[in-house]
């Protein structure tokens, strides 16, 4: 099997897809379809239920810039609190045990990764609205 670090961005996403599927299964969302969303830092997948409801699965990077599980949990708890107050923020989706953050490994992936699932927030990218 080719080393993870030698793979293209798409090749790495293919291997990390198993982590996204596991995170969705553990949240009762296993029937979602997945689409890779290119990003410069984390690996992101957009997930959609047959009824159109959307989610984002964020798989953290590996290495010195990676967030620890406790850092990701603090971020997720903060976003959950903001969402519960009525602010339009990406709301983390807990797993069946109530955890907002998961840590998974997979064959062919160099280390365990921190994974968080968020509800899809409709809108346009801010960059589309910025300009001179």
Predicted segments, located by residue:
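Juxta-kinase regulatory segment immediately upstream of eukaryotic protein kinase catalytic domains
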Residues: 1-32
């Amino acid at each position: 099997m080719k080393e993870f670090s030698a793979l293209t961005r798409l090749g790495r996403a293919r291997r990390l897809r198993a982590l996204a599927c596991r995170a969705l299964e553990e949240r009762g969302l296993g029937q979602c379809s997945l689409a890779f969303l290119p990003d410069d830092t984390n690996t992101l997948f957009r997930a959609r239920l047959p009824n159109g409801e959307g989610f984002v699965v964020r798989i953290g990077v590996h290495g010195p810039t990676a967030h620890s599980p406790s850092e990701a949990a603090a971020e997720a708890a903060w976003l959950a609190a903001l969402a519960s107050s009525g602010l339009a923020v990406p709301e983390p989706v807990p797993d069946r045990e109530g955890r907002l953050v998961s840590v998974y490994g997979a064959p062919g992936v160099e280390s365990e990764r921190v994974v968080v699932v968020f509800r899809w927030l409709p809108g346009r990218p801010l960059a589309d609205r910025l300009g001179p």
